[in-house]
Structures are given as C-alpha cells and as structure tokens.
C-alpha cells in the first residue's frame, strides 16, 4: 500500500460513463476480487493497468539486469499487486487503486532505464526534474495521459497526486489534501507550484535524461 505520508488529492472528474474501450493486461473473465473486477469495468484503471504491465515488462527485459535483481523485481511486483488488491479495504477503493498504479508507474520509470525508452507506445512521461526556489528539495514529476490526466510529484518522503483540471493554457493539476489545496500548473519549461501553507513557487521543469 502507499506510504501514509502520501498527500492523496481528491480525484476529480471520475469517469462513470458507459462504453469502456480499454481492457487491462489480465483476462477479465478470470478477474478475482473486488479490485480486479472494478478495473475491468473502469476505462481509466484498465489503461493504468496496461501501462504498468508494459513498463514492468520493459524493466524486466533489460539485458544488463542480473538474475538476482530480476528475482527481486518479480517479488516486488507480486507484492505490489497484493497491495493494490488490498484497496478494497480503503474508504474510496477507486482512488486508492488509482494512486497505487500511478505510484508504481512512477517508481518503474524512476528506477529503470527500460521503461523510459518507448514513451510513444504508452501514456506516461517522466520523471521530470522540477526545480523550485524555496522548495525543500528537488521534485520529481511523472505525468499520466488519461482522462482526467494526472501529475505525480515526489520529494523527500512526500508524495502528491493531482488531477488535471481545465486551463486556458498549459496543463493545470489540482488536489485537495488534509492540509489544504495544492496546484501544479505546467506551462512548458516553467511551472507554478502551490502547496498548502506555502507561497506560490515558479519552477523550472527539466526533461529526464
């Protein structure tokens, strides 16, 4: 499950319409438990599942990865799936599952080179380096191109998941946390970041290597 310190914003614009075109990486006829069944009925969650599996496969296929590291990655993925399926215990199972997927996507992209090599085939980008004068540390940002889209920011031991909202220009993301409102407005090489209890910061966004 996600660390307790995650600042999980309220998921905005939840999709509940009919006509789910996407399908997850697993066979929905064999879906087990509440979470897998929910994923099969939810277009956004199905896309997140397929993207997570794609990135995991790219990480696992790296020729330079040692046998012991592959075993560790396999164990980590099994543990993550168990944690995702435990989201049935959460007060908002969908928000929990969404956050689990995006956190896993971020970690796969951050920790392995393979998942960053075929972005044209997926729906995620990053992690980008976000440098903000006045911030506690360097911020890493991963972006997810679903409907709605998401921005996932991590720094030190903090994590913040924001949902995309309407904007006249650029890409604006917002979240409601226990501490207050948060906002990240990506305008190309620059972005504006607002965190609860702190003044707005103008940041520079740098593409991953």
Regions found by a protein language model. Name each.
Residues 22-209:
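N-terminal alpha-helical modules
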Residues 1-10:
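Bacterial N-terminal signal peptides that target proteins for export
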Residues 16-19:
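N-terminal signal peptide c-region/cleavage motif recognized by signal peptidases
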């Amino acid at each position: 499950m996600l660390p307790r310190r995650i600042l999980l914003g309220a998921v905005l614009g939840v999709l509940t319409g009919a006509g789910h075109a996407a399908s997850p990486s697993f066979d929905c006829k064999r879906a087990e438990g509440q979470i897998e069944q929910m994923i099969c009925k939810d277009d956004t969650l199905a896309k997140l599942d397929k993207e997570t599996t794609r990135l995991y496969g790219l990480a696992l296929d790296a020729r330079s990865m040692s046998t012991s590291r592959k075993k560790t990655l396999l164990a980590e993925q099994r543990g993550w799936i168990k944690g995702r399926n435990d989201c049935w215990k959460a007060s908002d199972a969908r928000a929990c599952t969404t956050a689990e997927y995006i956190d896993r996507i971020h970690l796969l992209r951050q920790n392995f080179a393979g998942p960053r090599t075929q972005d044209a085939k997926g729906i995620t980008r990053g992690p980008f380096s976000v440098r903000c004068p006045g911030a506690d540390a360097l911020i890493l940002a991963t972006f997810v191109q679903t409907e709605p889209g998401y921005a996932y920011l991590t720094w030190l031991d903090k994590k913040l998941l924001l949902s995309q909202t309407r904007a006249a220009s650029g890409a604006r993301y917002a979240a409601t946390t226990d501490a207050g409102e948060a906002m990240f407005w990506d305008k190309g090489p620059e972005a504006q970041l607002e965190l609860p209890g702190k003044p707005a910061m103008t940041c520079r966004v740098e593409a991953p290597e």
